[in-house]
Regions:
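Loop/turn-to-beta-strand initiation segments
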Residues: 7, 86-87, 170-173, 196-197
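Conserved alpha-helical scaffold flanking the Walker A/P-loop in AAA+ ATPase domains
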Residues: 79, 135-136, 140-141, 151-174
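Signal for well-folded cores of large energy- and translation-related assemblies
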Residues: 2, 41, 69, 79-83, ...
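Conserved RecA-like P-loop NTPase ATPase core
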Residues: 1, 32, 78, 117, ...
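Beta-to-alpha transition at the N-cap of a short helix in the ABC ATPase nucleotide-binding domain
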Residues: 74, 101, 114, 186-187
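Conserved AAA+/SF3 P-loop NTPase catalytic/coupling segment centered on the Walker-B
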Residues: 146-150, 162-195
């Protein structure tokens, strides 16, 4: 609505906080269509539009990359991959910190731009994964699906289309732990997205 040049929009009350994130448009929440009709007819004055402030978001715990002891070469490779937004493959026995290092990747990547935050928030909203107290995703996503994930759950779609793990990792990190345990057909789903990005 804001992109179309509209000046105001009416949303279900439950979505008001999320809608106010957009900016550039006055957002009003209504509980029923009857309430909307009353407002549109001008029988009652419009309330103040919802205002969103990133400062109102609860603080998120951010694991620190400096918490990791040892593995200097792996940490350096991770920093270089993050800086260049490259894919990275960790190889090593269990318990060497591969998952711990990968889980910190979103926190060493550059901060998301406003457009990236809105894009990620839209994906999480339509997936039903946007926390009620956090209408704007500010940290890069980190997704780590189990090796039993299906190709459909990885790519998305289905009878009731939903974003898959690839989409949920948009602008963030998709970590596939125990890569050899994944079915070959499931890994094949990754071919096109990896070739395109």
């Amino acid at each position: 609505a804001a992109a179309a040049g509209l000046k105001r929009c009416f949303l279900p009350l439950e979505n008001l906080r999320e809608g106010s994130v957009i900016g550039g448009i006055d957002c009003y929440g209504v509980s029923t269509l009857a309430e909307l009709a009353v407002l549109l007819r001008g029988r009652t004055p419009l309330p103040e539009p919802a205002v969103f402030s990133e400062e109102s978001l609860p603080l998120e715990e951010t694991p620190d990359f400096s918490d990791l002891a040892g593995q200097e070469l792996v940490k350096r490779a991770t920093l270089l991959a993050a800086g260049g937004r490259h894919n990275i493959l960790y190889i090593g026995p269990a318990g060497t910190g591969k998952s711990m290092i990968a889980s910190r990747l979103p926190y060493i990547l550059p901060a998301m731009s406003r457009e990236e935050r809105l894009s990620v928030s839209e994906i999480y909203s339509i997936s039903g994964l946007l926390p009620p107290d956090r209408p704007l995703m500010t940290k890069r996503p980190y997704r780590s699906p189990h090796h039993t994930v299906t190709g459909l759950a990885l790519s998305g779609g289905g009878q009731k289309p939903r974003p898959g793990e690839i989409c949920l990792a948009h602008e963030g990190v998709l970590f596939l732990d125990e890569l050899p345990e994944y079915h070959a057909a499931t890994l094949e789903v990754l071919r096109q997205p990896l070739e395109e990005h």
